[in-house]
Design a protein with these regions (language model features):
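N-terminal, polar/charged subdomain of small-to-medium soluble alpha/beta proteins
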Residues: 1-92, 106-110, 114-150
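Short glycine-rich or small-residue beta-strand-to-loop segments that form or flank ligand, phosphate
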Residues: 92-99
Length: 150
């Protein structure tokens, strides 16, 4: 189980291959890659900046990952989340889950990204033609995370 918060980009294919090579019990792998969009709520986005609270963010991601491990029989998981300034089409986040069977891999991957979007302490600002604006939490993200409440 690996969590990395980093400024530099990542190679998703390499990361998945490396994760699978560690464990021959894996029968299914699911991944999610989040990208910077060029539009948000109808506005053009020139760039996005993500900030985080060093130490607190890592602890929260560990808790989220532990919750997934309590719910599904995962063999491996990987969360890579970037911070800093990124432009449209750049990768932001990679979530990979691996299990003996596909159902656990699919469900846990969806759970991790839903909870990461709402429970991990990242702050996002966007550069638009109007200037730099802080992005508020979206109700749709909260609803997606709420469906996983026990």
């Amino acid at each position: 189980m690996t969590i990395r918060i980093q400024k530099q980009d990542f190679d998703a294919g390499y990361e998945i291959k490396r994760l699978c090579a560690r464990n021959t019990s894996i029968g299914g792998v699911c991944s999610f890659i989040g990208l910077v969009r060029e539009t948000q709520s109808g506005s053009s986005v020139k760039a996005m900046t993500l900030e985080h609270y060093v130490g607190m963010t890592e602890k929260q991601l560990v808790k989220i990952e532990e919750e997934a491990l309590d719910r599904w029989p995962l063999e491996e998981s990987l969360i890579i989340h970037r911070y800093g300034r990124m432009v449209p089409s750049e990768q932001i986040v990679l979530v990979v889950t691996a299990s003996a069977h596909r159902k656990a891999a699919f469900e846990s991957c969806e759970f991790l990204i839903d909870w990461l979007k709402t429970k991990a302490p990242f702050w996002k600002s966007e550069e638009t033609p109007k200037g730099k604006e802080w992005v508020q939490a979206r109700a749709s993200d909260d609803m997606a995370a709420d469906r996983w409440q026990k």
